[in-house]
């Protein structure tokens, strides 16, 4: 079978899955993307796209559209979390050296806008919403996918881009689920003048 005839299934229609589908299509390969959500909703928060990402998004032909819904910071400022004291700064747009050095811009974008831009570039081609993966079966030369909606798909290659609770990973690792690392991270936004007053709210905040 030539590479053009390979049936590729991507489990997960997030940032990784959609970007992969676009990259494969640019190389003449079609991937079917199966996403459990019935619609691509506005979930998540800000995503930082440094030059290694924006360079590839430009190559995929989607950077200009994404730039319209992105911000390009003047500089990245690092502050002490307790008193707001400035520790360091990394110029981005301020002196123009970032693009000069890396050949692409640094953007901040909402995850939903990034996902929407990627799915829009696919034009709906090969994107199947409402497909929650139920089981994977090794059929020798092919892999059988079954979804909770009763649909099935036979693929020559399956890519797992289905997140932290990946069904594909459980299949590959013989049922092993996620393993807690012992570390959690929480994020939020507060007004800058509230920083010193809110820095001690978290339990074990000095650990």
Give each language-model segment a name.
Residues 17-18:
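N-terminal Rossmann-fold NAD(P) dinucleotide-binding loop
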Residues 25-45:
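Glycine-rich FAD pyrophosphate-binding loop
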Residues 38-58:
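Conserved N-terminal glycine-rich FAD pyrophosphate-binding loop of Rossmann-like flavoproteins
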Residues 8-10, 31:
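Conserved hydrophobic helix-helix packing surfaces used for dimerization/oligomerization
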Residues 2-8, 52-196:
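Conserved N-terminal helical subregion
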Residues 203-207:
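Active-site substrate-recognition segment that forms the wall
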């Amino acid at each position: 079978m030539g590479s053009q005839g390979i049936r590729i299934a991507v489990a997960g229609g997030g940032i990784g899955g959609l970007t992969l589908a676009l990259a494969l299509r640019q190389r003449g390969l079609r991937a079917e993307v199966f996403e459990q959500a019935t619609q691509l909703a506005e979930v998540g928060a800000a995503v930082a796209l440094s030059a290694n990402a924006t360079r590839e998004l430009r190559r995929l032909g989607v950077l200009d559209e994404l730039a319209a819904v992105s911000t390009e910071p003047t500089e990245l400022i690092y502050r002490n979390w307790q008193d707001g004291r400035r520790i360091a700064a990394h110029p981005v747009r301020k002196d123009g050296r970032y693009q000069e050095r890396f050949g692409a811009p640094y953007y901040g974008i909402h995850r939903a806008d990034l996902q929407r831009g990627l799915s829009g570039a696919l034009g709906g081609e090969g994107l199947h919403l409402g497909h929650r993966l139920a089981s994977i079966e090794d059929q020798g030369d092919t892999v059988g996918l079954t979804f909770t909606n009763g649909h099935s798909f036979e693929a020559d290659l399956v890519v797992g881009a289905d997140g932290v609770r990946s069904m594909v990973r459980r299949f590959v690792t013989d049922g092993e689920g996620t393993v807690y690392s012992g570390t959690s991270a929480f994020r939020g936004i507060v007004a800058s003048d509230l920083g010193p007053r809110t820095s001690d709210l978290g339990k074990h905040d000095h650990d």
